Amino acid sequence: MAKPDLSVEISGIKLRNPVMTASGTFGYGKEFSDYLDLEKIGAIITKGLSLRPKAGNPTPRIVETPGGMLNAIGLQNVGIDAFIGEKLPFLRTVDTPVIVNLYGNTLEEYGELAEKLDRLPEVAGLEVNISCPNVKQGGIVFGTDPNAAAEVVGLVRRSTSKPLIIKLSPNVTDVVRMADACVNAGADALSLINTLTGMAIDLQKRRPILANITGGLSGPAIKPVALRMVWQVSQAMAVPIIGIGGIMSATDALEFMLAGATAVQVGTANFLDPSAAQTIAAGIEDYLAKNGISDVKELIGALKI
């Protein structure tokens, strides 16, 4: 039997395999280049970018929890100008699609970022983090209100012709409603889920462990929630989905594909094993070969109910 076909496509972005790296867990790519072959994964998704450099939250801002971790990094990043001048030159040398994750605290910031990134041919697509507070509207999180989310997506859509992936928050009562609002406003694809809001407490000090009090929960603990949401959205609409949440192995990745994901993102696993994404991609190929499956796309949405 010939080698299985692992290639998939997300809104015109062709991936050699369905394994991407999750924003915020893989730096800007170069940081991990000594630990894995960047040309053996499907795509690199950068650390979230803002218009200006951001220092992030005070420490402590990471804490291990049963089955995962909480982080309150605060979207620390170098800013768009330093990314273009210092980070992008390396990414140009890698034959793997680069998707830039971006965020803003106002509609205008999202639009300006998208316009700047639209001019960069090296950027294959944009992933928009809408789990941010709108500082001009009382701090409401864009990604928890369908109307606010649609405003962001619509503005970014008008600001770029690049494939547009919207990263959905799980901190909502109806993820399908949020997904529908984003797709109707111009999203080409959806990635889900972002982290669940959680907290940890130091019993002896009677204080929160994180300086920020709350943080984003990721890792195996959130996988069942992520699987459920991916499945719900895939059943409700025909849109490419990228599954995220507790993917630590090829088995995890394949479960997300059965639930309806076209591709997956590996996040927390990168902290435990810097070569995790490549290992998972190889594991998917091994599964296909052992089970006589010629094309990974046969598994997308193949869950039997």
Curated annotation (Swiss-Prot):
It is found in: Cytoplasm. The active site is at C132. InterPro entries: Aldolase_TIM, DHO_dehydrogenase, DHOD_1B, Dihydroorotate_DH_1, Dihydroorotate_DH_1_2, Dihydroorotate_DH_cat, Dihydroorotate_DH_CS, Dihydroorotate_DH_I. Pathway: Pyrimidine metabolism; UMP biosynthesis via de novo pathway; orotate from (S)-dihydroorotate (NAD(+) route): step 1/1. One of its GO terms (biological process) is 'de novo' pyrimidine nucleobase biosynthetic process. It comes from the Bacteria. Keywords: Cytoplasm, Flavoprotein, FMN, NAD, Oxidoreductase, Pyrimidine biosynthesis. FMN binds at S23, K47, G48, N101, N129, K167, I193, G219, G245, G246, G267, T268. It is an enzyme of class 1 (oxidoreductase). PROSITE patterns: DHODEHASE_1, DHODEHASE_2. One of its GO terms (molecular function) is dihydroorotate dehydrogenase (NAD+) activity. Its main location: cytoplasm. One of its GO terms (cellular component) is cytoplasm. Binds 1 FMN per subunit. NCBIfam families: PRK07259.1, pyrD_sub1_fam. Heterotetramer of 2 PyrK and 2 PyrD type B subunits. Belongs to the dihydroorotate dehydrogenase family. Type 1 subfamily. Catalyzes the conversion of dihydroorotate to orotate with NAD(+) as electron acceptor. This is Dihydroorotate dehydrogenase B (NAD(+)), catalytic subunit. It comes from Geotalea daltonii (strain DSM 22248 / JCM 15807 / FRC-32). The gene is pyrD.
